[in-house]
Swiss-Prot record:
The gene is dxs. Catalyzes the acyloin condensation reaction between C atoms 2 and 3 of pyruvate and glyceraldehyde 3-phosphate to yield 1-deoxy-D-xylulose-5-phosphate (DXP). Thiamine diphosphate binds at H72, G113, H114, A115, G145, A146, N174, Y287, E370. Gene3D superfamilies: 3.40.50.920, 3.40.50.970. Mg(2+) binds at D144, N174. Belongs to the transketolase family. DXPS subfamily. One of its GO terms (molecular function) is 1-deoxy-D-xylulose-5-phosphate synthase activity. This is 1-deoxy-D-xylulose-5-phosphate synthase. Binds 1 Mg(2+) ion per subunit. Binds 1 thiamine pyrophosphate per subunit. GO terms for cellular component: cytosol. Pathway: Metabolic intermediate biosynthesis; 1-deoxy-D-xylulose 5-phosphate biosynthesis; 1-deoxy-D-xylulose 5-phosphate from D-glyceraldehyde 3-phosphate and pyruvate: step 1/1. The keyword Magnesium applies.
Length: 629
């Protein structure tokens, strides 16, 4: 059978192992072809091809449920659930999403883009199944990196106390999340990864005991436990952990041996209780470059399949904000041993890999544990350290209570750098960094800021570290503007001080962060129509520069705010609240992201759809304030 002929995963039923192996080769070929052309997650999917095929041969996906953690490893799933012909549109506007999405396919049973959610969701489905009296199977597939997340461990703890609830958790253990996994649990998994597979003692042990002369069917209580006792002696140490938590442990299993995987999954389904199947895979399997560099090939832009090298863009791009942040923090750490960089399993993505390489003693990776990262930093700040927590905007949402309870209320000097703030592009709604302005504005004691360019990022970083309370600095995804940066001598900003970039009397445009450059472009378009704009770089959303903004607004009487974040509770709302609190009755036109989910597309495509391109903003400003005359 050809992969292109698969329209339903149940077509895998009855295929031989050799036929499945042939389909596995076709999946890898298609996977590599598309990702090398348009970019996407590479290594995770290549590592679970055999696992996916074997698992789906043991399930009826018209009824059974599978929850894939994060979705990085979901490309093989998509290819065998009817999306082969559309796969060229992966992560493109109106195309196949990069993550599982319930609205895209009936086989995407649960959507996700953040880690560690799968076991909770699958357990919820299992409980719903049992209450309805149904009998479909529920499976969660989770990576060893995601297993470091507290939510996954909470779900395991809960499921283990439901011994009569059938649930299969497949641990995809490739010794790698996005960055190498950290922590005691990861070390524990490493100890057993190369252990011989554990073949569990079946109920025949108890049957054998029954056949002992003089005992027969009346088994003493002490002997009833013999099976469990012998099993615990045989279980590898990591298996013992899951056994103690109420799971039956199976493994470790070779994740590329389809026949053995099928047998193991069938055995797991028969147990009718919580089972953890430990599957050992190779991230990037089948593509030597991805196997050799599992971090670099976790996700890739377009690349040459023959050489494995990224295809350079036609136009050289300036260095990214993330790298500028990482390089600047390294310089600061070299000068101050009390400064410590903290990440939650995203060293490369946040730019902290340079700190990890050069000063590992001032670098901490907590794993996929954002809540812990925040409170860890809070504790460190109590005893004189200066923690800088670098987390994607979308992932910091997971630690909102810790921001309030552990940092804000106690007014602790913790610096947060929110990477990927604003519109991020092809990763879609699970990864858009559109909410941080809104959710952080409400927390007392926090200072919130965003730079207009790379140089201002450096100044804001030293400002944050020097501040005696909590700060949050948001930076956008991707390249900077090409503004020159300094190796040292960064001048701190005055907290809450904005700046006027251009003078004008017709319209006041107050822009925040990445939208300052767009505001300047918009002003040029307006100037061509004899409309002169006063452009203010707000720098801070909390506190606002009241002394600068209010007199300008009172004089010009027409105000526009620009932000790359959700409008509800955002920067524009802060300006409106400022005017309202000071009884200034001035029309304010807020430009930002409305109350919508921003789907996967390129950043510019998303901005165009939202009306955030300079030409669109200029036209809308003219219409809003009737400036045609």
């Amino acid at each position: 059978m050809l992969l292109s002929e698969l329209s339903h995963p149940n077509q895998l039923h009855g295929l031989t192992v050799s036929q499945l192996e042939e389909i596995a080769c076709q999946i890898r070929e298609r996977h590599l072809q598309v990702v090398s052309t348009s970019g996407g997650h590479l290594g995770p999917g290549l590592g679970v091809v055999e696992l996916t095929l074997a698992l789906y041969q043991t399930l009826d996906l018209d009824f059974d449920k599978v929850v894939w953690d994060v979705g990085h490893q979901g490309y093989p799933h998509k290819l065998i659930t009817g999306r082969f012909s559309q796969f060229d549109s992966l992560r493109q506007q109106n195309g196949v999403a990069g993550y599982l999405k319930r609205s895209e396919s009936k086989f995407d049973h649960f959507g996700a883009g953040h880690a560690s959610t799968s076991i909770s969701a699958a357990l919820g489905m299992a409980i719903a199944r049992d209450r309805k009296g149904d009998n479909y199977k529920c499976v969660a597939v989770i990576g060893d990196g995601a297993l470091t997340g507290g939510m996954a461990l909470e779900a395991i703890n809960h499921a283990g106390h439901l011994p009569n609830t059938p649930l299969v958790v497949v641990l995809n253990d490739n010794d790698m999340s996005i960055s190498p996994p950290v922590g005691a649990l990861s070390s524990y998994l490493n100890k057993v990864r190369h252990s011989p597979p554990l073949q569990f003692l079946s109920d025949s042990v108890q049957e054998s005991v029954k056949n002992i002369p003089l005992i027969g069917k009346d088994i003493p209580e002490e002997l009833k436990n013999i099976k469990g006792s012998v099993r615990r002696l045989a279980v590898p140490k990591v298996g013992a952990v899951f056994e103690e938590l109420g799971f039956t442990y199976m493994g470790p299993i070779d994740g590329h041996d389809i026949g053995n995987l099928i047998n193991t999954f069938n055995a797991a389904h028969k147990l009718k209780k919580p089972v953890l199947v430990h599957v050992v895979t190779t991230k990037g399997k089948g593509y030597p470059y991805a196997e050799a560099d599992q971090v670099g090939y976790h996700a890739q832009s377009s690349f040459d399949l023959t050489t494995g090298k990224s295809i350079p863009s036609k136009k050289p791009k300036p260095i990214s904000y993330s790298k500028i942040f990482g390089q600047t923090l390294l310089k600061i750490c070299e000068q101050d041993s009390k400064v410590v960089g903290i990440t939650a399993a995203m060293a490369t993505g946040t730019g902290l890999d340079i700190l990890q390489k050069n000063i590992p003693d001032q670098y901490i990776d907590v794993g996929i544990a954002e809540q812990h990262a925040v409170t860890l930093a809070a504790g460190m700040s109590c005893d004189g350290l200066k923690p800088v927590v670098a987390i994607y905007s979308t992932f910091l949402q997971r630690a909102f209570d810790q921001l309030i309870h552990d940092v804000g209320i106690q007014n602790l000097p913790v610096s947060f750098v929110l990477d990927r703030a604003g519109i991020v592009g092809a990763d879609g709604p699970t990864h858009q960094g559109q909410y941080d302005i809104s959710y952080m504005r409400s927390i007392p004691n926090f200072v919130l800021m965003a730079p207009k360019d790379e140089s201002e990022l450096q100044r804001m970083l030293i400002t944050s570290i020097n501040h005696k309370g909590p700060t949050a600095l948001r930076i956008p995804r991707g390249s900077g503007l090409g503004v020159a940066v300094m190796d040292e001598g960064w001048e701190p900003l005055n907290i809450g001080e904005a700046e006027i970039l251009e003078e004008g009397n017709d319209i006041l445009i107050i822009a925040y962060g990445s939208m300052v450059a767009s505001a300047l472009e918009t002003a040029e378009l307006l100037k061509a129509k004899n409309i002169n704009s006063c452009i203010v770089n707000a720098r801070f959303v909390k506190p606002l520069d009241k002394k600068l903004i209010m007199p300008l607004a009172s004089r010009i009487q027409k105000v526009v705010t620009m932000e790359e974040g959700t409008l509800i509770g955002g920067f524009g709302s802060a300006i409106v609240e400022l005017f309202n609190d000071n009884e200034i009755n001035i029309p304010v036109y807020r430009i930002g992201i409305p109350d919508v989910l921003v789907d996967h597309a390129s950043p510019d495509q998303s901005k165009e759809k939202l009306g955030l391109m300079p030409n669109q903003m200029a036209d809308n400003i003219i219409k809003k304030f009737d400036l045609n005359n």
